[in-house]
Design a protein with these regions (language model features):
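Topology signature of small-to-medium multi-pass alpha-helical membrane proteins
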Residues: 1-217
Length: 217
């Protein structure tokens, strides 16, 4: 019994610490008027508190979330080279090597964090105690599948959109509005009330910037 409680306390402390750091960074970004979004912060602190107190019900929830985030970030990392043209990756590295490397390092850190949380909460003492207490102790297969699907499906849809008529039209309009001096990479598209709105990345050797175009269907 003591061993499983020690594992929960260890994971709880890490989650609380990570959540507090994330909240502090969120406050900093708000004060600097920078955009920032995260899946951790408050949820990590709350989950950490429950685990620290030895809640086996929280074990199932946090394990599911860790499995989902692990598969999500691993899928993102694997698909990363294919999400942008090689030339755009090269331009990003040349213009902001530190920012790009920090972004990749953050993704790797998140993968390692969620892997550690998952393996800790799937350790034999925790699984055994959860099962004996009547809580679910099965592998969260759906969480893994959902994490992969939420990366692969949108990426696949965007790939086909770029190669379709709508993608070509978005690039054509962007060239008209923002000039021929840029190359354009489609990053998002939405349809509403007969209008189409597309988000693109415009880039050349000197700069990279986000642009938007809109047209009627």
């Amino acid at each position: 019994m003591y061993k499983y409680r020690a594992i929960l306390k260890r994971v709880g402390i890490v989650l609380i610490a990570v959540g507090i750091l994330d909240i502090a960074y969120l406050v900093y970004c708000i004060s600097q008027q920078k955009s920032y979004s995260s899946s951790l912060n408050i949820l990590a602190v709350v989950g950490g508190v429950f685990l620290f107190r030895g809640s086996l019900r929280a074990v199932h929830i946090v394990t599911w979330f860790a499995a989902f985030m692990l598969s999500y970030f691993v899928s993102v990392f694997i698909l990363l080279p294919f999400l942008k043209p090689a030339e755009l990756w090269g331009t990003e590295f040349r213009l902001d090597p530190v920012g790009l490397c920090l972004s990749l390092l953050l993704t790797i850190t998140l993968i390692a964090l969620h892997f550690w949380i998952y393996t800790q909460l799937r350790a034999a003492p925790v699984v055994s105690e959860s099962f004996n207490s009547g809580h679910s102790a099965s592998t969260p297969k759906f969480a893994f599948i959902l994490g992969v699907a939420l990366v692969v499906l949108p990426a696949g849809m965007m790939h086909f959109t770029r190669g379709g008529a709508a993608g070509a039209k978005a690039v054509e309009i962007a060239r008209t509005q923002y000039g021929q001096d840029y190359k354009y990479h489609l990053t998002g598209m939405s349809w509403s009330n007969g209008n189409v709105r597309a988000s693109l990345t415009a880039y050349n050797e000197q700069e990279i910037k986000p642009v938007q175009v809109e047209w009627e269907q």
